[in-house]
């Protein structure tokens, strides 16, 4: 009788015992009168030794990735053949029976981590690519993490509730994926961009702690960290402040990193305001694994003779600087030109610089800073071989963002980023609105359901540009991992927000009437957060794209080479739905 086991279950206790393993053939090695098979299942790899003549004839028919059944005797490897890097490296199976369960066609690419197959080929044969250890392990880690999330929240009395996936189209910034209704011709459902309104309705219903591992859909251009369909941990709580949510998420992530990666995070993440993040790092999602911080030098240059700086300051603009210590000699003209190209992307007045040599400014705009030279050297403790970069712009935000991107580029070039570090950060107190120069209207900076901080409520309509919301983001290594807020629970205030963004009563009733009505029935104060599961696992596994941690992702054109979706449907289906396809003018 053979004991059916998995590859990882080979151990000392089974030595000289009969075992049976079902697995795939990873490698075939012929050595004269005997052959080795390296086999693999989900759990581990193992080595099979074939010596019997009738079995060697079967092996002649076996190719890579055949699915086979091996029955044999577990024996110890000779000392010179031990592989201490494998948990099964001390044993091998002496084959007694071999059965081919299923053959494998010629492979489109080798099942190896370093194969050079194209992305489309890997996605077309995703079921083969998933046999690679590195990809398989990422998917398994994702399963472990979501399991931990569920257990963590259920233990804290959260209810896992499912919200609809056919919803009313209420665009939240990106385009909706729409679904035509056969029964209600001319009407459409939308796939949810998030469960935002439904989770707020859940709070109004009295379920004070909700979570969901939610599938969400946004019709937007694909990027390395975006897909048309994605997964997020969505949660909401009644009667809370943002600090309650911070503590919950910090403890949850502490558990995930400890159990999945054996990494002990701090149980209390750093916290900074949006304004500090922009001023110090030039980003609302700063990478804090390295210092290299921005400084505002406007005050020191208020009497500057340099016309560019003078004009900017006369227009109440900003001058941001970045000081790189003891590295001036590494910045060639070509390298500085590359940094200037980044500044141009933000339509700044340019990137300026000067170096410190012999205790004075040298090169770049040194000749325009003679008056301020010694004052700046003293104020910023500048030393020989330092280099100082300047960006000036009439808009504070543009100056910050441009210099923030240059900060990242310099950090990468100088190798300042510790890739083994996980730096979490809460960014809070975001602006409630942004002004859209194209439409000349205010739009929500995050979304339209976030409550303003109390001191801004009375003057909302008068100064929407100054309003700060109870809004917060969770950032990990410069990537926005999650976003949340304390929500509006008052119908009148919600309508005021709608009015500011141009959703007057008729329009807001049409789009959100059902939600406004619900706010009339004893809505509790509540807040929550959504955390991108795909992004979290991408960062935990040090992947370069969320495609690496999604089981069956789309390609960069939001298409699936695996099943050739999206695809056309028949004229009969279109007719049934009452849809006519406009001719393609291209």
From Swiss-Prot:
Transmembrane segments: none annotated. Belongs to the class-II aminoacyl-tRNA synthetase family. Type 1 subfamily. Aspartyl-tRNA synthetase with relaxed tRNA specificity since it is able to aspartylate not only its cognate tRNA(Asp) but also tRNA(Asn). Reaction proceeds in two steps: L-aspartate is first activated by ATP to form Asp-AMP and then transferred to the acceptor end of tRNA(Asp/Asn). This is Aspartate--tRNA(Asp/Asn) ligase. GO terms for biological process: aspartyl-tRNA aminoacylation. The record marks 31 as: Important for tRNA non-discrimination. Homodimer. It catalyses: tRNA(Asx) + L-aspartate + ATP = L-aspartyl-tRNA(Asx) + AMP + diphosphate. It is found in: Cytoplasm. It is an enzyme of class 6 (ligase). GO terms for cellular component: cytoplasm. The gene is aspS.
